[in-house]
């Protein structure tokens, strides 16, 4: 069989009986395998040489022909062809079945494919196939119906009654006849008519049936091929039988399964020849069906066939499925030769592009190269001799090895390979010993440390592979993190500590205050020991003297020439910033040089500093006692309020946790202050934390402050804090509480790592075929981006979101009118600076989400490749990079819990509103009432404020150059002051002149207010920075009276909707609305006036605490009822990772909110079946119904005006609702924001475009709403591009196009619905995917990476793209590349 390498596509179909026979080289008639005496295969058996080929090379079975010269001759005695024994891997046989048999994939898997075609239920189909019931094939002129099932008695009765005028049968024969008689075209049109009749209420079964029928029609498969008359036998080398040491044999399970089939088949044949009784024949047929089922899929059956030692046998399906199956074990994850692994140790003397390989390992890895050189140098003349020289390890061998490995890169890999930086290329350097030496700065990319980690080495062999290793994979070409473009090669730990020590400043040390005219003099003074590294000195730089320290001079002097003087204390953050800046300004070559210098300086001065920790370095603040006493007093007050019944149990708990969190924070601040002052900032513990070398504020707090609150395993916080720290030692109870958190940490780590790994796998699978394929897709759509702010605080600047993208619109300067950015121009760092200067902070950019490339994405929509800060090149596998960028931090984050040791991470809740900067209150929104001279918000509200960025008294101004409300930008003239100096603006904003002040103010911002907020200011007020303007209760949401009157209870019945509980701790009676839902009861509180007329009504949600009595008088602003917030949980990505999972899988959240479907006015209706009906009446007066579970806390009241997409009740948002109500763009923004929120909280930076790539893949399909004149089926899910294509064709022919709505599919489902059946089959549900693909006759275009890896092609990205396939690497000379 010739090798097939050059093919573009692969197709899978159902094999017809003729096709199976044409593959076969002969029929297997006996179940014997090999002869026990001769150990040669038996004739006509499962290993027969006549069928499958000879077992001995170029020799027939009987030995008549023994030589290659008889190649191709068939022996006349034994009928065995003289050929190579490798044909036993390719040649197939077959078994002629004595009775037809159904294929388990097509009848057993849900939904049963045969069942759908014939419209028979799975259980009925089973009973026919297993010879329990008859099915009527032709009713003739009887009362029977076609396809009617008859049991034994009914059949006998019908036989007696009608004789031969009808035909009924059982088993696979009956099903085969029915399938042969199917008219697919007629059936298809019949079902389409049924679908149109049913319209919206079409059931899934109809759609499934139609899809299967269409698939059969398109593929050319015949339905009756799902029933087999002939069974293929796979080649014997694939189901081998090998002799073990003790003379026993080990055999593949498949041989046992085949043996059972053959035995039963032969027995059935004999019985049929003997005309045996029907009942015996039927039983044998059933057994044959069973044995064929277990051959194809043993694990899917109820009664599994077991072999020796009671182990289920592995069938053909099992060989494909799962992690140990053919796809994942052998095709996607192969073991590689020319590789080795060993423990890693640090190699501080290496350059960034080098790694140390143990000499012995290198000799083994490069053996073939060494042998070649030995023969070339004529030291030996054959390979055998060369091998023995290598074993003796003579000197010549080492010399040759040295030459061979020069400039021959090797790849180093550390498992788990979470992102592409887990494999990098290095130039090998031979080292003594048996450990691989690794450069300390690449550890971060590998996430490696030297506590026993192992790494694998791989040798790229071909010149092309070596060239790619040098050009693309060398560690010096991988300085940036592809997830966000920040440097990933940066110093940490010892290096940081050394440089921090070197660049710190210290008072009163040798040489303080001296002046030096140049750097060399400083270095001389240090060498002569007349100057301390940390001394403050003055050095001439350029024309002037600058104040610096000797150490900083040493550092700057060592850096490459171009880099300007660095005059600050270097912490890890400062070093990363420095590396980033140097990369942007000077490029990678200077950075690489600088990194090696930084590494050497860091290690050198860390050694000189020689820091050690002693108990006296851990300083416990004297004030600790005061803080703890204050906290205890506050807690006593909270307890007192609780005892009086003023607050509920949940509020008490939340308040206690909040007090301890605040206390801990205050104590930590005090402790850090003390440590900073200790020894002029040279306290070692403080230095380690401040420099970022080791440890964190959190860990020091546990050493010298207090351990604080701990979390239970459930995530709840234990309200009893650990007041001691590790220096003082823990009491027994404190130690016991501690163990809880520590154990949680370890258990979480183990479980969550697997979760994160699985997330990565699903992400890779959905995005693996997203490759940059074209330059420009020509779209005119884009997405809006702006800086992400929380109030005035910028969380993520515009730069992070827009740099490296392309603009979709032309942007002109608002002042000069010049074009700053043109359409389709790249947004660079400089362009962003220009835009910021003129005050533009919103852009519309091209994005992967709006890219219209048919396959993958285009260069312009993707923008910049973060791994090298250049525009992305065609052929870049951006999908996989996106998946790795999202998955890799997931794994890192799961391990985060465990380092803090389970200390609870709950912030203390604020109960005040105060802004960091001065502002003017511009307006209010939301229902509020006047109470005690302030405003009380009875519902959620919004403050509209303008921040004051700059202010100056009018009295100091001589001449004003600007007017009220004018926009100003940086550098614009504002005024001339009394001394005649022109003052320029250093801000962007608008001029406001008020209260004799000239101010620059920002654009209006919104601040949301909770229910029950009390506001102390009025519209138009100027408020100075930090002033408290309002207060609220952070732990409870009140329901507040908005009118004055008398309370009247409605549907509040004790024991039904109201329960009274006596609190055992306080003895108070708590009145609480139950959360049970009653059909007709709707608990409410009415307020009535003097005449008894209802003037207000308040719906009470479940779990609300009543604060009033029936008939009581009430005033405006009084609290009617309270809803407690749930107890504080500690926030950790343990909560975050499942959240990311849910978003990517588009799961419907448990506690769902209902969103308004349209904008309009809310109208409350009665409760029906435990759900409250709320109508939203739109502008045309149309009512849109919303059903909300009774007992949910409503966020709207009768008569409120809502916008489409507003939440009507408490709960989580369902992404599918967002798509339906607000459309695709809003959904993309929602998913992006939610996913980013989880990562941002953990301090992980991932660029939006990576998440965008995944979301794009989730929104690839649309659902057909109206069929028009297309071939689509109503409710079918189809690919967007296929939909547009077919519509285009139909419109051109003058037909009516189909209409579809966008849908969102979770990543697992989307991976299984992918175009490539090979990729889908190797992901999950292998047999199901292959079953459907074979019916549809699917063609795999081999576009993605995975399918090409499976079939052994180069992946179609980078240098493997079709563009480059015709390019050949040629050597100039005969020497090795």
Swiss-Prot record:
Binding site for Mg(2+): 449, 451, 453
Cofactors that this protein relies on: Mg(2+); Zn(2+)
Keywords assigned by UniProt, alphabetized: DNA-directed RNA polymerase, Magnesium, Metal-binding, Nucleotidyltransferase, Transcription, Transferase, Zinc
InterPro entries assigned: DNA-dir_RpoC_beta_prime, DNA-dir_RpoC_beta_prime_bact, RNA_pol_asu, RNA_pol_N, RNA_pol_Rpb1_1, RNA_pol_Rpb1_3, RNA_pol_Rpb1_3_sf, RNA_pol_Rpb1_4
UniProt key word Signal: no
Residues annotated as binding Zn(2+) 2: 777, 851, 858, 861
Gene Ontology, cellular component aspect: DNA-directed RNA polymerase complex
SMART domains referenced in this protein's UniProt entry, alphabetically: RPOLA_N
Metal-binding found in the keyword field: yes
Pfam entry (one): RNA_pol_Rpb1_3
GO biological process, one term: DNA-templated transcription
Binding site for Zn(2+) 1: 60, 62, 75, 78
GO molecular function list: DNA binding; DNA-directed RNA polymerase activity; magnesium ion binding; zinc ion binding
Recorded catalytic activity of this chain's protein: RNA(n) + a ribonucleoside 5'-triphosphate = RNA(n+1) + diphosphate
First-level EC class: transferase
Cofactor note: Binds 1 Mg(2+) ion per subunit.
EC number(s) given by UniProt: 2.7.7.6
Gene3D superfamilies: 1.10.132.30, 1.10.150.390, 1.10.1790.20, 1.10.40.90, 2.40.40.20, 2.40.50.100, RNA polymerase II, clamp domain, RNA polymerase Rpb1, domain 3
Its biological purpose: DNA-dependent RNA polymerase catalyzes the transcription of DNA into RNA using the four ribonucleoside triphosphates as substrates.
Complex and partners: The RNAP catalytic core consists of 2 alpha, 1 beta, 1 beta' and 1 omega subunit. When a sigma factor is associated with the core the holoenzyme is formed, which can initiate transcription.
NCBIfam families, alphabetized: rpoC_TIGR
Similarity comment text for this entry: Belongs to the RNA polymerase beta' chain family.
HAMAP family xref list: RNApol_bact_RpoC
Record-given protein name: DNA-directed RNA polymerase subunit beta'
Gene from which the chain derives: rpoC
